[in-house]
From Swiss-Prot:
Record-linked InterPro entries: Metallo-B-lactamas, RibonucZ/Hydroxyglut_hydro, UPF0173_UPF0282_UlaG_hydrolase
Protein name: UPF0173 protein PYRAB01190
SMART domains (UniProt xref): Lactamase_B
Organism expressing this protein natively: Pyrococcus abyssi (strain GE5 / Orsay)
Alphabetical list of PANTHER family matching this protein: METALLO-BETA-LACTAMASE DOMAIN-CONTAINING PROTEIN, UPF0173 METAL-DEPENDENT HYDROLASE MJ1163-RELATED
Keywords: Hydrolase
Family under the similarity heading: Belongs to the UPF0173 family.
Amino acid sequence: MKIVWYGHACFLIKTKGVSILIDPYPDVDEDRMEKVDYILITHEHMDHYGKTPLIAKLNDAEVIGPKTVYLMAISDGLTKVREIEAGQEIQLGDVTVKAFYTEHPTSQYPLGYLIIGDKRVAHLGDTYYSPSFKNLRGQVDILLVPIGGRSTASEREAVDIVDIIRPRIAVPMHYGTYGGGSAEGFKRELQRRRVWVLVKDLKPYEGFEV
């Protein structure tokens, strides 16, 4: 499995012959992206949906997201669009995607995604801490967790989320663009709280394989 962070909450996940892009924000550089088959959107806010129409058309990719995203994509002239709800499970080739509710009060239908391929990756979109995340414990190898603290988890709340889910690897996101937070601050808070996890501190357009 290959995971690339394109900045903000935007990631590319390549596994089992499938390329999945998540939350392409307005400033992401589509010219630096690999080919994508599917675009998963966690919710309707423009810092997560931004370049979806352009990238979908360039790649002939299917867009998948909650009801508001479905309606936005249709209104933008996209035809390969699928709606997904919390609790629903779909197959993208040999990859399983499970949608779950996240705690983002300013969104109508906020979702996170558990992507099951060679490894299990959870993308939390925009979220605060939620006790319901305990349901993910034991299911997540790599956690993509927001730390920026602007309408989403702060560094401290992100540690609470890591502590309740207990992944093997945590990748901080949703910082350095809109809002505060830093990977170093997140790592310091993990150490201070004695929450042990391997942190992948990526630079935009940098990736790793697991």
